[in-house]
């Protein structure tokens, strides 16, 4: 028994359109999830993750660097983005030397300038933090 609504549609037709449309979009969603899951391992740079990178991430988290800096766009906007700091400062050894010297030289006490606190990190912690920042800079963000 189908009751006709205005415009000639029946309740059964409306139900079928709803179910068909819902199924269509669920399948589209599942396809996109599958595609994304297949592509993520190519972009995460997980193969290059070393123990130094893991320790560097721990230094990053313990000192709340994200409280002032951004990393891949996430975090606070008080201080510079650090995902590509190594590449911006010359890459390879020169980038690492710059980052470590900068960290050791803080605060600069320049009037009117934002100051980074001195964290008194050991050379090992600085090396690990630099490795973490290098690794982060090599993640394929596809230019976002």
Model-inferred region functions:
Residues 1-49, 132-144:
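Post-cleavage N-terminal segment of exported redox proteins
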Residues 15, 39, 43, 55, ...:
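Arginine residue identity/basic-tract feature
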Residues 45-62:
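Short extracytoplasmic/periplasmic juxtamembrane "stem" segments immediately C-terminal to an N-terminal membrane anchor
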Residues 51, 58, 72-76, 83-140:
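Extracytoplasmic electron-transfer domains, predominantly the class I c-type cytochrome c fold
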Residues 65-68:
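Short cysteine clusters
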């Amino acid at each position: 028994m189908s009751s006709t609504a205005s415009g000639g549609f029946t309740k059964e037709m409306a139900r079928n359109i709803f179910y068909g449309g819902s199924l269509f979009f669920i399948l589209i969603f599942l396809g996109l999830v599958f595609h994304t899951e297949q592509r993520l391992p190519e972009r995460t740079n997980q193969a290059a993750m070393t123990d130094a990178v893991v320790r560097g991430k721990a230094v990053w988290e313990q000192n709340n660097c994200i409280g002032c800096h951004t990393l891949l766009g996430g975090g606070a906007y008080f201080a510079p983005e650090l995902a590509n700091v190594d590449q911006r400062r010359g890459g390879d050894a020169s980038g690492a030397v710059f980052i470590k010297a900068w960290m050791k030289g803080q605060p600069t006490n320049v009037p009117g300038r934002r100051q980074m606190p001195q964290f008194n990190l050991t050379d090992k912690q600085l090396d690990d933090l630099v490795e973490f920042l290098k690794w982060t800079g090599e993640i394929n963000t596809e230019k976002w």
